[in-house]
């Protein structure tokens, strides 16, 4: 009888520990899933990902970007910047999408839409869930 009680306590403790581990992983992933991408002139950019808050990510991305930059935030997503290789200070495009492939394709499409001739991806970033 004593052995089965000890075994039951151990099983209960194991289940409790696994529940905490799974729940803790979910909390950490959600808590650190904000990012930002700053876009400037002539291919300048800044990126920040896996921050606890969008404002903190935006500030960090803008700090990395040279000159006047515009920041977009991403939460559980990816961002990409495409520039025209023939004219890096000319047409560019950026996108924020749930999947990296979609953001890369859309950024390139936007670059061509604004007159780019040889658009290439300059930079990309994803947060924890993107």
Describe the residue ranges of each PLM region.
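Secreted/extracellular ectodomain signature
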Residues: 2-6, 28-130
């Amino acid at each position: 009888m004593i052995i089965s009680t000890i075994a039951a306590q151990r099983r209960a403790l194991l289940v409790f520990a696994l529940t905490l581990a799974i729940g803790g992983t979910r909390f950490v992933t959600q808590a650190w899933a904000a990012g930002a991408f700053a876009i400037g002139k002539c291919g300048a950019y800044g990126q920040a990902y896996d921050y606890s808050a969008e404002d903190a990510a935006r500030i960090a991305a803008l700090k990395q970007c040279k000159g006047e930059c515009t920041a977009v935030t991403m939460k559980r997503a990816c961002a990409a910047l495409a520039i025209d290789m023939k004219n890096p200070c000319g047409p560019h495009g950026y996108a924020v999408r749930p999947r990296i492939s979609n953001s890369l394709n859309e950024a390139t499409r936007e670059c061509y839409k604004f007159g780019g001739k040889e658009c290439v991806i300059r930079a990309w970033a994803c947060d924890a869930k993107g």
